[in-house]
């Protein structure tokens, strides 16, 4: 169902994402992407408790039999900001031998999941969530972020997953035995955490998509060449995916 429990008629995908109109996500998942392809994307990003034969159309709304972890969600969102390249979340970045040679370098382990331009368009829409949608209040003063809110019926679970050009963070709030949350503070937790880890970082804008797409309900064409420095920024700064869990 939609986050506000109402139907708003036809709308752009940007509006649907920013206002959490889940009927749009469900229709795209069922009719355009197809459940087989949609679940396939998740399997390619290390979601370990999802099985194709147990997934229904409810998967478009996060309705999985065994659920997902914050680590898996952080890895998936990091794939978007990394231009479609999935890297398995890990605590180990690099291991050097006594000669200083890298014998383990996790930054070089990646696999292609999404098209680069599609990821940049998705980031642009997730940016709207933070600036004027359900995620207003999540952005720290020292970073530019994009992300998405998530809730279950009766507010028994609350999520916020988001990222900057430097870090990706997934927040979950809930009880071991599900019951309604008295208050939801995922946005505040995300904002405070991201503020702390960006204290020594410069604000960096997200990379821009090329081509025609809908922005702020108007069709625009944007073509922006990326400099070598812009292209490599993400590869140098997002080798670690911080993940945090919060429970009341």
Question: Where are these predicted regions, by residue range?
Answer:
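A penicillin-recognizing enzyme superfamily signal
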Residues: 18, 67-229
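Active-site-adjacent helix/loop patches that line small-molecule binding or acyl-intermediate pockets
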Residues: 1-49, 54-82, 128
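Extracellular mucin-like PTS domains
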Residues: 221-246
């Amino acid at each position: 169902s939609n986050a506000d429990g109402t139907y708003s008629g036809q709308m752009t995908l940007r509006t649907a994402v920013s206002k959490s109109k889940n009927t749009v996500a469900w229709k795209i998942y069922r009719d355009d992407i197809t459940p087989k392809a949609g679940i396939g994307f998740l399997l390619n990003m290390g979601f370990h408790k999802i099985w194709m034969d147990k997934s229904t159309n409810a998967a478009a709304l996060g309705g999985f039999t065994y659920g997902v972890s914050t680590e898996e969600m952080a890895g998936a969102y990091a794939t978007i900001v990394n231009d479609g390249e999935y890297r398995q979340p890990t605590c180990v970045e690099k291991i050097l031998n006594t000669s200083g040679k890298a014998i383990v370098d996790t930054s070089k382990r990646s696999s292609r999941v999404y098209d680069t331009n599609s990821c940049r368009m998705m980031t642009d829409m997730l940016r709207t969530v933070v600036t004027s949608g359900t995620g207003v209040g999540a952005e720290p003063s020292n970073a530019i972020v994009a992300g998405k809110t998530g809730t279950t019926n009766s507010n028994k679970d609350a999520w916020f997953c988001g990222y900057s050009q430097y870090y990706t963070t997934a927040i979950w709030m809930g009880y071991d035995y599900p019951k309604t949350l008295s208050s939801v503070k995922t946005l505040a937790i995300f904002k405070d955490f991201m503020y702390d880890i960006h204290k020594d970082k410069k604000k960096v804008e997200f990379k821009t998509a090329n081509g025609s797409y809908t922005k702020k309900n108007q069709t625009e064409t944007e073509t922006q060449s990326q400099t070598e420095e812009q292209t490599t920024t993400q590869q140098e700064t997002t080798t670690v995916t911080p993940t945090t869990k919060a429970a009341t």
